[in-house]
Amino acid sequence: WGMKLFLGEYGHSLDDRARVTLPRKIRQEIDERELILAKGFDPCIFGFDRGSWEKEAAKHLDTPVTDTKGRSLRRYLFSSAEKVEIDKLGRILVPAQLKEYASIVRDVTVIGAGDHFEIWDRETWNTYAKDLEVS
């Protein structure tokens, strides 16, 4: 496979320092130690490796500054974005404002979403996933 794809669904928990261990299969798709986390469009956190983030950023930066909706999307995505490092044990620190945005307390579900991964509060994800199955 030439293309990187983030796949799967994994249950994890935050530790007392708000770190989560990234699933091995997610880490295998990442070539570097630095990631970008940002607010998702649903109540979740988007996670990107450098290449995926650069592609996502380019899409938004190509939108003319005169495009009101494009400007709003750009502000939404970039203002919440933070660089985080993967430590030697495969953990990342979940920034407080992103944790709060996604209503994450302890138990999370990490899902692959193709070109990025997402971190959800486990109960929120379970409810959302049930709705996906019904529709």
Name each region found by the language model.
Residues W1-H12, D16-R19, K25-V84, K88-L89, ...:
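Flexible "stalk/tail and boundary" regions
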